């Protein structure tokens, strides 16, 4: 009988991969994740620092976004080449924006999510956010119907509940905390997905993002907008989940911290 092993899968909004490359490579060396979904690359396809990634033993697939180099998503793996299955979310109302990439790695289908911010709310950007989440719902249901072990990990740009924010009253007018956005997230989870952080930390205030201003990180004035949702076939193999706050305290770092799950395969 083949021995089982644990895989650590992380999601990290790097907020500019080239400007934070030292942060990323240091974190990869120290935390040693097996698979990583990166969001907000802010680079073109040609500008992705593949040499630095490969030097640390990772293979990668990515999709940048020209010409202004916003958005961008990538999947890194040191446990086998990612077999790309999608470079965009089916039904995305704006396919020019790089917000989703998907691959099979070690028998797991990994969808890397970078949902629209949606601000200002109300307005066309918020309308796009809701339409994008509708497309995610449809694809997520297809994944569940397929019965494959799957994870949708990344920056959802949704604060699900009051427990996921330091001071809810300060976010009442923000698209990340809008009732319609929260409802979309609840409906997604209700399809049958497991929110990994809440599975292990049901009553704790766990944050993944702290604004740069007003010493938010030092005061732990954060929000939880980065999530990992696991299909039933993978959730039964879930062994742990958390947030690595360490790199958020480094110099010239992202305003997000990486969140992670461990699964046994």
What role is predicted for each listed range?
Residues 41-44, 50-120:
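Structured beta-strand-rich core segments of catalytic domains in phosphoester-bond hydrolases
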Residues 1-55, 62-73:
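N-terminal, active-site-proximal structural segment of metallo-dependent hydrolase catalytic domains
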Residues 87, 130-144:
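Internal catalytic-core helix/loop-beta-alpha segment
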Residues 45-47, 85-92, 162-265:
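Metal-dependent phosphoester-hydrolase catalytic domains
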Residues 26-28, 52-56, 127-129, 168-171:
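Glycine-rich, phosphate-binding/catalytic loops in enzymes
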Residues 9-13, 28-46, 110, 139-162, ...:
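Active-site beta-strand/loop signature of hydrolases that rely on acidic residues for catalysis
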Residues 90-91, 116-133, 169-174:
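Surface-exposed cleft-lining segments at the edges of enzyme active sites
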Residues 16-20, 95, 128-136, 177-180, ...:
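Soluble or luminal CAZymes and related metallo-dependent hydrolases
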């Amino acid at each position: 009988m083949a021995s089982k092993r644990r895989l650590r899968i992380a999601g990290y909004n790097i907020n500019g991969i080239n400007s934070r490359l030292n942060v990323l490579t240091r974190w990869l060396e120290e935390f040693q994740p097996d698979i990583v979904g990166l969001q907000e690359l802010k680079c073109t396809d040609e500008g992705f620092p593949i040499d630095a990634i490969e030097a640390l033993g990772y293979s990668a697939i990515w999709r940048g976004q020209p010409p202004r180099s916003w958005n961008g998503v990538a999947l890194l793996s040191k446990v086998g080449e990612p077999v790309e299955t999608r470079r965009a979310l089916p039904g995305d109302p704006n396919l020019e924006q790089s917000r989703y990439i998907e691959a099979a790695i070690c028998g797991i289908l990994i969808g890397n999510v970078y949902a629209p911010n949606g601000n200002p709310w109300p307005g066309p950007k918020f309308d796009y956010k809701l339409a994008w989440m509708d497309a995610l719902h449809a694809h997520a249901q297809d994944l569940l119907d397929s019965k494959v072990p799957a994870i949708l990990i990344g920056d959802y740009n949704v604060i699900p509940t009051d427990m996921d924010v330091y001071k809810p009253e300060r976010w009442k007018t923000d698209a990340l905390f809008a009732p319609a956005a929260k409802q979309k997230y609840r409906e997604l989870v209700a399809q049958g997905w497991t929110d990994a952080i809440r599975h292990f930390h049901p009553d704790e205030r766990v944050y993944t993002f702290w604004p740069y201003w007003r010493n938010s990180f030092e005061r732990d004035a954060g929000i939880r907008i980065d999530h990992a949702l696991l299909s039933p076939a993978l959730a039964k193999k879930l062994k742990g989940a958390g947030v690595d706050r360490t790199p958020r305290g480094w110099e010239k770092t992202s305003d997000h911290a990486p969140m992670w799950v461990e699964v046994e395969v």
